A protein has these predicted regions:
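Short, Lys/Arg-enriched N-terminal segments with co-localized hydrophobic residues
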Residues: 1-6
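Terminal accessory/anchoring regions of large secretory-pathway or extracellular enzymes
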Residues: 39-86, 92-95, 113, 351-530
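Membrane-interface motif at the C-terminal end of an N-terminal transmembrane signal
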Residues: 25-39
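Extended, loop-rich substrate-binding clefts of extracytoplasmic carbohydrate-active enzymes
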Residues: 197-255, 371-382, 386, 390
Length: 530
């Protein structure tokens, strides 16, 4: 999709955002060059007699790929596959019994995605068994094409668009879908009793930059066949784009919270203006604090409702998501961040009233850096949207130091897909943010705004009444004209009321509950746009 959004200064920019898949056009000759490179590299590092696979071979391959000019994937699919609509594409299903791990009593199974519709790029997928690499070959006989009438004779050399892994996640008797890799460098996963929502990506390049965003692709995959008692499965992915190449290792462990241990080695081809590490992509259409109202019977529609940050100083920040008229870019400057993620905090089905989408069952995702990431900032991009089919929220870590050629970048992190946050934190979750006209009933002040914030802090009624627990509020622009903290008899927690008088400029507001000089809640961080 091309989004034309009007910035505050009325300058129009064109912002390219990938919502479901990257469609990268190329030429067949270019794809042949990659295949030649691939075969040469495999022959050089992997097919020496009696030499078994090790991950270092793939690192060498990624570095060699980055040293060569970028070759875009080919656009050589039959028209009948390109023209498939959403429902027609979904009608093509992989037959489970054709999976390479089916019937082997392994803890995981592989199933594949067919090419077609938005997914036009063939991705080689390999299996590693006892240290040997085996290509997983495509056959149209592996798929049920449903009501589609396709000439499968022309599809024999097609290849796959991506894959998914299944695991007895919710019951021992059934292999549930656990994780999928499909489109560009997108992937997503599930914990127990969750439904797909937000996604992650391997790398983000120049997001929300006027020159346009670049979407790296996973060029090839290697999956290590697990043993019968293994609790985890390992996937290697070769990343490629005009600006960089890299090798990614994913060690995936299913459970109540599914965990991915990610190791990313990135080799820039050129200087990159803005590099996004550990990007997360989600959807927020409207919710409790949305000023841009929708004519919709549902109270809320979103896959995530806030950004949670644990910065290098140990502060917990909560930024409620919004869908305004303007492109919003927020930067949380930090050094060695301890974690960040997009959360679906509201789990009440009555707040969504959508018993097909089940937004209350969407997973949250938390990025936990391993080692020091240095100086930089966590960036949040919120894009105006009118439909829930569009992912319009992106967050990632931006290193302060520019990525330059011939300098390898190495990032490790643990990525949790969860319902309940898997790390220890301060109490005082911010559970809701409401906003509206300032003043009180009968004395409204339309030049002011009122914010109401619910804190999940229990057993604090006496401390609030005695002034031991207080509310601290600040605004970078405008004026805080009133603040009040009270016990909430309905939630049994605390509720804050803030009156804010804007001055026509963008303002960063902060609020927290403080006791004896220390925060006993998350810090509410809110960006006000005129």
């Amino acid at each position: 999709q091309f989004w034309k959004v009007k910035m505050k200064n009325t300058v129009k920019i064109t912002f390219w955002i990938m919502l479901t898949a990257a469609v990268v056009l190329g030429i067949n000759a270019g794809w042949d060059k990659y295949q030649e490179f691939r075969q040469a590299e495999l022959a050089r590092v992997m097919t020496v007699k009696d030499k078994k696979f090790d991950p270092g071979q793939l690192t060498e391959m990624a570095a060699a790929l980055a040293a060569k000019p970028y070759v875009p994937p080919a656009d050589n699919l039959p028209d009948e596959l390109k023209k498939l609509n959403y429902d027609q594409y979904r009608d093509i299903r992989f037959s489970r019994e054709n999976g390479p791990w089916y019937g082997k009593k392994l803890p995981f199974e592989i199933q594949f995605f067919h090419l077609g519709s938005l997914f036009l790029t063939s991705v080689p997928i390999n299996e590693i068994v006892n240290g040997r690499i085996h290509p997983l070959k495509y056959s149209p006989a592996y798929f049920d094409y449903g009501k589609n009438r396709l000439n499968t004779d022309e599809l024999s050399e097609l290849g796959y668009a991506g894959f998914r892994l299944h695991n007895p996640l919710n019951t021992r008797k059934y292999y549930d879908e656990l994780v999928s890799f499909l489109g560009a460098s997108y992937f997503r996963a599930l914990g127990k009793h969750q439904k797909y929502g937000l996604s992650a990506r391997g790398l983000a390049i120049d997001t929300a930059v006027q020159t346009g965003e670049e979407f790296p692709i996973f060029r090839e995959f290697w999956l290590v066949r697990p043993k019968r008692n293994d609790k985890s499965v390992t996937v290697y992915a070769l990343l490629d784009s005009p600006s960089a190449a890299g090798i990614y290792t994913f060690v995936i462990t299913p459970g109540e919270n599914t965990v991915m241990d990610v190791d990313a080695k990135i080799f820039p081809r050129k200087e990159i203006n803005k590099l996004g590490i550990a990007p997360l992509t989600s959807m927020y259409l409207f919710g409790e604090n949305t000023k841009n109202k929708f004519d919709d019977h549902r109270p809320e529609v979103h896959d995530s409702d806030g950004l949670l940050v644990l910065n290098g100083n140990g502060e917990w920040l909560w930024r409620p998501l919004d869908n305004s008229k303007y492109l919003r870019i927020s930067a949380f400057v930090d050094e060695n961040p301890k974690g960040f993620g997009l959360l679906q905090r509201d789990r009440d089905p009555a707040h969504y009233l959508d018993f097909e989408a089940n937004y209350e069952q969407r997973p949250s995702a938390w990025v936990e850096p391993v080692g020091d990431w240095g100086k930089g900032w966590i960036e949040l991009v919120e894009i105006p949207s009118q439909q829930e089919i569009h992912d319009n929220v992106v967050t990632y870590w931006v290193p302060k130091e520019k990525a330059v050629p011939q300098k390898e970048l190495h990032y490790r992190y643990r990525l949790y897909w969860f319902t309940k946050l898997p790390v220890k934190k301060v109490p005082g979750d911010i559970t809701a943010t409401y906003t509206g006209i300032g003043g009180v009933s009968g004395m409204l002040e339309d030049h002011k705004r009122k914010f109401v914030i619910d804190f999940d802090i229990l057993n604090m009624q006496k401390e609030v009444e005695k002034g031991i627990a207080t509310l601290e509020v600040s605004a970078s622009e405008g004026e805080i004209t009133g603040k009040h903290l009270m016990y909430n008899p309905v939630t049994k927690g605390l509720t804050a009321y803030i009156d804010f008088k804007p001055n026509g400029k963008t303002s960063e507001l902060r609020a927290s509950v403080v006791k004896k000089g220390k925060n006993i809640s998350e810090i509410w961080s809110y960006q006000w746009l005129p």
